[in-house]
Amino acid sequence: LCSRLELTRKRVFLQKSPLDLSFFFKLSGRMEAEGHPALFYTPARPMLPPPDYDLAAEVQKHDVLLSYPYQSIRPFIAMLKKAAQDPDVISIKMTLYRMARESQIVQALMEAAENGKEVVALVELRARFDEQNNIDWSKQLESAGCTVIYGFEDYKVHSKLTLITRKGAEGYSYITQIGTGNYNEKTSELYTDYSFITADERIGEEASKVFRNLAVQQLTEESDKMLVAPLRFKSVLLDEMDHVIAAARMGRPASMILKNNSISDRDIILKLQEASCAGVRIDMIVRGICCVRAEVPGKTENLHIRSLVGRYLEHGRIYSFFDGTHTRIYIASGDFLTRNTECRVEVGVRVEDPVLVQKLTDILQLQLRDNVNARVMDASGNYQKVKPAEGEPLVNSQMGMYELLRNDWQRLEPWKCTTPATETEKTAAVCQEVTVEQLKQELPHVFQPAPEKAEKAAPAAQQPDHYEALEQMLNNKPRAAQPASKAPAAPRPVVKPVVTAPKKKSLLERIGSFFRR
């Protein structure tokens, strides 16, 4: 461990009891107050829409995709609060997995119930480490008049689904939200996630069907627009992979970009291997568990895997399939873990709006260019940090998202974006879908020049060791004198942290409560 993390022996401590790191939440505020700017990120706030922005009205014009934490969750909360007071809204239904301890989202649901609307909340009590918090919220929801469902006995409900039903002069209409992350105001400022909001009638009807099935503990077997695990999630994605494989075998420059947290599902791994052998270029962005090896000759030589670990926790799931002519892209709450594909109720959706397809494609391409937070897997399963070549500009995909989404509230068309598209992005055109029969037509040979070799990487700059400063502060030791040649740094003004982590029980308290049960 010392070797892999490049630590000296004096940085390692041995103890028999479980390690409780909850003190770090308090430590961060103390360290900032005492002046240690080098240990902190520059404050960054989620971008807000114009003051007159109305998400519910915007969704009636076109689909909307919010990207957290770069864009604020406040427009979604405002839409819920408005629905709670709208006399034409007859019901609000939502799946709740992890909620903030002071949740405006749950407050909006309770307000809607108090206003006489039908409110259905599916609360998953088995959300790890949030069991007590979810129990407390479920009691308050019931007291406010909400119908609370506690999910399945054999399947954990991990989906992020909201359905607002409105009855107007022209009949019923829906606003459906499908996300990759929780309805949690705190984590929406720490995790990267995507929230798709639409007024599509067919998606609304399918979402209504999902809630009806959840109410009677039945799984959703049929859906057209939505992916619903465990019966209609993996099968749809495998079909998409088969479609791309067929395109590659006919000579098209087919490719896939798959972004999620983890992968362990055997069926998907075997299909990825088949796609690689068929000539499909596969780029995977996998932050956590990865049970497939990249670039193994004869098996996964066309499969490239990278992990992004930076300021924010990469939590979004995007699945993009390019058959050489057209792009089909999905977002979902589920990863490629067997527990997600077979043992949980997950929800995903195909994004069809051309502007949003291009937006998601730009996000994926930006992350594939990252040379600051990225580590790539080699054939042995080891990860190597990406080192920029000499003269190559640094690309931090997380910070680049602020620029990418700078004009997003104005909804610029893809061809009006300020960021120029790369050759790869130009190839991934957004067009109507193509059938397998069309793929079987004779195709012209597609010439693709070999990629240029990067120049020799420049030696990495030596990073300052902040451990010494941390130890000195904790032990109230004076800091070592700086060399005379260096001017002392100006004191940093005291500012509050960007996000304050919610108070949780310590690990020892959780273990003790477990044994008391």
Label each residue range with its predicted role.
Residues 1-256, 274, 278, 290-312, ...:
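N-terminal localization/anchoring segments of enzymes in phospholipid and broader phosphate metabolism
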Residues 281-285:
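Hydrophobic alpha/beta core scaffold segments
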